[in-house]
Amino acid sequence: MHLADLIETTLIGMGYELVELERAPAGLLRVYIDQPETGIVIEDCEKVSRQLTHVLTVENVDYERLEVSSPGLDRPLKKLADFVRFAGAEVRVTLRLPVNGQKNFVGILCEPAGDAGAEKIGLEFEGKDGPALLEFAISDVDRARLVPVIDFKGNQRKGNKQ
């Protein structure tokens, strides 16, 4: 079984999603996980790390160190399900080939539409001549990430004024 398939199968069984898998120099194996309903906390990373350590040992996978992490605020979008889940969010997209001389776009993601396997994704962005819509397929994407939204007031309780 391929390493990514092995890890993804294990994570699905635990109720998590594999966002990204990275093999780095010196035997480092990085696994980025998510849980769509609740997000990720440190206890999730610990639990997954313990389970993957056992699975990788049993499967005789060669690695020196394992890191399990959340995908972060600027989470990558890779699968069609990611583009569906984050429709309405602000994203940064880099296309493989330029469209009208431009490869990098930042805008609001529209839900994918079209026939299965030929879905088109929309991105509403501010063009040179005003609001514009870019349509592209997942295969056109080099990189896509959420634009982090940081709300420093989000942790304040209502009625607790200073």
UniProtKB/Swiss-Prot annotation:
Cystine bridges: none
Keyword Isomerase annotated: no
Assigned GO CC terms: cytosol
Principal location class: cytoplasm
Gene3D superfamilies recorded: Ribosome maturation factor RimP, C-terminal domain, RimP-like superfamily, N-terminal
Xref: Pfam families: DUF150_C, RimP_N
Subcellular location: Cytoplasm
Protein family (similarity comment): Belongs to the RimP family.
PANTHER family on file: RIBOSOME MATURATION FACTOR RIMP (PTHR33867:SF1)
Biological processes, Gene Ontology terms: ribosomal small subunit assembly; translation
Function: Required for maturation of 30S ribosomal subunits.
InterPro entries membership: Ribosome_maturation_RimP, RimP_C, RimP_C_sf, RimP_N, RimP_N_sf
Protein name: Ribosome maturation factor RimP
Domain of life, per lineage: Bacteria
Keywords, in A-Z order: Cytoplasm, Ribosome biogenesis
